[in-house]
């Protein structure tokens, strides 16, 4: 038992040596470089305004344009969309429906087709104008 109850040895305190001085001076931290690339939801608008240089997709100010609603969109995509709208007959159909609404004297909302009698008449009239 005497062996187990040995008193803990007291550590001799080492002589304190003179503290070494740390690095003197050093380099000044550089400010972070401001990004020229616009990211996120308002990326195109910030490039269009001129606050950023380009979008993450690579669009620059000269490749952006405002659409009818005032949104900043890609010039190339906008032109392509307009071309497809005319090419695939959607423009022709919209013109036909507009003409039919005018001929039938329909104002306000009216579903083309559907279950109502007015809607069915409008659809038939629209189709007749579309085929011409």
Swiss-Prot record:
Q: Where in the cell is it found?
A: Nucleus; Chromosome
Q: Where is the signal peptide?
A: none
Q: What keywords appear on the UniProt entry?
A: Chromosome, DNA condensation, DNA-binding, Nucleus, Phosphoprotein
Biased-composition ranges for Basic residues?
1-44
Which biological process terms from the Gene Ontology are attached to this UniProt entry?
chromosome condensation
A GO term for molecular function = DNA binding
Q: Where is this region: Disordered?
A: 1-84
UniProt xrefs under InterPro entries:
DNVP
> Compositionally biased, Polar residues: which spans?
57-66
| PTM statement from Swiss-Prot or TrEMBL | Phosphorylated.
**KW DNA-binding (keyword) present:** yes
Extract one GO cellular component term from the record.
Answer: nucleus
Q: Which domain of life is it from?
A: Eukaryota
| Chief place where the protein resides | nucleus
Keyword S-adenosyl-L-methionine recorded: no
Q: What does this protein do?
A: DNA-binding protein, which similarly to histones, may compact DNA into chromatin.
Q: What else is known?
A: In yeast, DVNP5 binds to histone binding sites in chromatin and displaces nucleosomes, and impairs transcription and inhibits cell growth.
The protein in question is named Dinoflagellate viral nucleoprotein 5
What organism is listed for this UniProt entry? Answer: Hematodinium sp
């Amino acid at each position: 038992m005497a062996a187990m109850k040995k008193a803990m040895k007291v550590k001799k305190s080492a002589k304190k040596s003179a503290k070494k001085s740390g690095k003197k001076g050093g380099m000044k931290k550089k400010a972070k470089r401001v990004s020229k690339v616009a990211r996120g939801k308002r990326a195109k608008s910030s490039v269009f305004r001129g606050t950023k240089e380009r979008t993450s997709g690579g669009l620059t100010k000269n490749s952006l344009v405002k659409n009818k609603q005032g949104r900043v969109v890609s010039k190339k995509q906008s032109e392509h969309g307009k071309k497809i709208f005319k090419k695939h007959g959607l423009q022709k159909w919209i013109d036909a429906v507009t003409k039919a609404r005018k001929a039938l004297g329909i104002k306000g909302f009216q579903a083309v087709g559907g279950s109502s009698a007015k809607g069915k008449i409008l659809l038939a009239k629209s189709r007749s104008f579309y085929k011409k």
